Amino acid sequence: MTPQPRRRLVLASQSPARLGLLRQAGLAPEVLVSGVDEEAVTAPTPAELALALAEAKASVVAAKPEVHGALVIGCDSVLDLDGQALGKPADAEEATARWKAMRGRAGTLQTGHCVWDTASGRHVSATASTVVRFGEPTDDEIAAYVASGEPLHVAGAFTLDGRSAPFIDGIDGDHGNVIGLSLPLLRRLLADLGTGITELWAPAED
């Protein structure tokens, strides 16, 4: 029996971290940025906002003619601190204030996931949550971290796999979800659409 050709996989995100997670899991997605105006999307809670943003990104890319037949993944992450949704800080001043508010405390990183099957027109979505326990960096350490520029490009002004890693005491939940994508949740969403994640593995290199 002739094996079915591997489905195209499209990541509706410009995040190098999400792309890296997918590649490490044996997947080889194409990248097509949605261009969604994130500031225009609102929702009552941080978890609902993360999901709404993920759904918006995936739906915009799924509607493009050039991806017809592909599976499209959209994700977005938001830090929930005291019920407030914290995305990327607007500037260095805001990033500094965020870190001074977060240190010694815990927040919940909410990552919305949406997968569109453009062949069938079906889509599924869900949110994964991971508790992040922040350490207590000094004012000088916060200033140095903000000066590096890294916190200006990531949700919550921190990243688990970058320069802020020493300032995070631990997490409760999925490590990948904090970086930007929960692979266990992605597997379940793909299964809901009738696709096994192993069917999407890229051929092993010789």
From Swiss-Prot:
Enzymatic reactions: a ribonucleoside 5'-triphosphate + H2O = a ribonucleoside 5'-phosphate + diphosphate + H(+); a 2'-deoxyribonucleoside 5'-triphosphate + H2O = a 2'-deoxyribonucleoside 5'-phosphate + diphosphate + H(+)
Enzyme Commission (EC) number: 3.6.1.9
Any one GO CC term of the record: cytoplasm
InterPro entries documented for this protein: ITPase-like_fam, Maf-like
Subcellular location per the Swiss-Prot or TrEMBL entry: Cytoplasm
Protein name: Nucleoside triphosphate pyrophosphatase
Superkingdom of source: Bacteria
Family per similarity comment: Belongs to the Maf family.
Active site annotation, chain numbering: 76 (proton acceptor)
Chief location: cytoplasm
Cofactor(s), names only, from the UniProt record: a divalent metal cation
GO molecular function: nucleoside triphosphate diphosphatase activity
GO terms under biological process: nucleotide metabolic process
